[in-house]
Each structure stands twice: as C-alpha cells, then as structure tokens.
Curated annotation (Swiss-Prot):
Changing residue 152 to A: No loss of dsRNA binding capacity. Loss of 40-60% dsRNA binding. Binding capacity was reduced to 5-10%. Loss of binding capacity. Coiled coil: none annotated. GO terms for molecular function: double-stranded RNA binding; miRNA binding; zinc ion binding. There is a cross-link at residues 114, 170 (Glycyl lysine isopeptide (Lys-Gly) (interchain with G-Cter in SUMO2)). It comes from Mus musculus. This is Zinc finger protein 346. It holds the Pfam family zf-met. The gene is Znf346. SMART domains: ZnF_C2H2, ZnF_U1.
Amino acid sequence: MECPAPDATDAADPGEAGPYKGSEEPEGREPDGVRFDRERARRLWEAVSGAQPAGREEVEHMIQKNQCLFTSTQCKVCCAMLISESQKLAHYQSKKHANKVKRYLAIHGMETIKGDVKRLDSDQKSSRSKDKNHCCPICNMTFSSPAVAQSHYLGKTHAKSLKLKQQSTKGAALQQNREMLDPDKFCSLCHSTFNDPAMAQQHYMGKRHRKQETKLKLMAHYGRLADPAVSDLPAGKGYPCKTCKIVLNSIEQYQAHVSGFKHKNQSPKTLVTLGSQTPVQTQPTPKDSSTVQD
C-alpha cells in the first residue's frame, strides 16, 4: 500500500509523528507487502515486551531489527509519516506507538508465537528420544537407525560400559566419604573442605574453627552435647537453646540464658556443679509455658 506524503496542513507538531492523509489504517489489517512469519513475530515481540526504547541508539536498533514495519521516515503499524529526526525519535518512544504495536502483535503475531511455544515443548521431549536413537554417550557410539540403537542398548557391550560407569560413580562416592573422614581434607565441625594439609592447618588455627570448638565445649558443659542442632548449626550462626526455642548471639548471652530463672523453669534439666561435675536432677516450678528471651 502506497501512502502519500502529508500536506502542509497535515504536518505534525514538533515531537509528534505526521499522520497519513486520511484515516489511519485499520489495526486488523497487515501493511501491504508484509508477511508475518514466526521470525518476524519473535523480533517484534522482543521490541515491545521490554521497556520502551530510550535514546537514539535503541530506536535505531529497533528499526534495524524490524525494517519491514519501521523505517526512519515511516511507521507502517501506526500508518504515520515521520518527516524529521525529532519526530522519528518522539514517535518510536511514545506510549501510543507501543500500545499500537502490542495490539498489532496480538492480532497478527501471538497465535504464531503461542504455536511455536507448544511445538518447542513437544520438540524438546522428542529430541531426547531422537538423541538416544542417534548416539550412546556412555559407549561413544552413533547409530544409523533406531533399530540399530535398540540392538546396541540390549547388547553386552552397552551393559558392560554401563556397569563400569556405575562402579566408577560408586568409587567416586566412596573416595569422597574417605576424604570427609580425613581431617586434612575435611572439617566435620565446620563443614569445610581443604585442598592440602597446609590449608587444613590454617583453618584449624583460625577464628571460625576456634569459635565452633568453644561452642561445642560450652554445650557439653551444660549437658547439650547430644543435641543434633548444635553440630548441624553452621559456624557463626549463634548458640541455640532447643528447650526455649531461641538462638543466642554470643557465648556470654548463652551462659547468662541457661543460668537464668526462665530457662531453668522450662523443663527438667541437669545442673552441673563446678566442684564435682555431678549432675543433679531438678524439677521445674509451675510457670507459664510461653517462651521469652532473656
């Protein structure tokens, strides 16, 4: 469709796109000579799905990717003539243009894109099956047909390679377990791994490990060594009291809490005397079960 240049009376104000002479082209109709294929739908969707173009470079990039619809002098979607550089920039950055492009895409492009998305999902599922019928990554073999592939997967060669791979995986897991038991490679207290003994020694002399050791000794002193939450809690994450369901931020806070009246009256517990270290069972006094941090 050829669109005449605007008359002097039709020229737009600065910053506005000049309209075609006459009414705008109906939105449901594609511009003449434009075939709306999948690739064009994708490019146009990318152009309007994000933020509006800001600045000359983004506008030029949008025009370059969608030359079938946008040029420096004409917007076929809005049926507008752009008679100056300022009008071109103002038009392509306007909300009115963006809204018309979205409506245009909804009419001509969304069905195309939706169809592509559905096909992509089914294609991905079928491609895995096709890949399996084309090659075996375990045995590093390729097949000329699905029948040859099926014969391979049922054969002794594939079964042997699969068994070796499984054994290798198990061996790697056992090696990892052995490394976790080696203090020069893994610290079970801090859940840290080391590449060499020097790195391990540096860790064991560091503040983080010492803090975890102090935490563990403190819990043991107050009869909390059997609490799994203590050893599972990462270093630097506080000092938990499962009885009161709170976490203290420092050793001093924890000591003050477990020595306090509120903690002692939550449930029966063991008090350790400083002289004999003999545990003595005490019974709680009647108290509200609500938990309040000291």
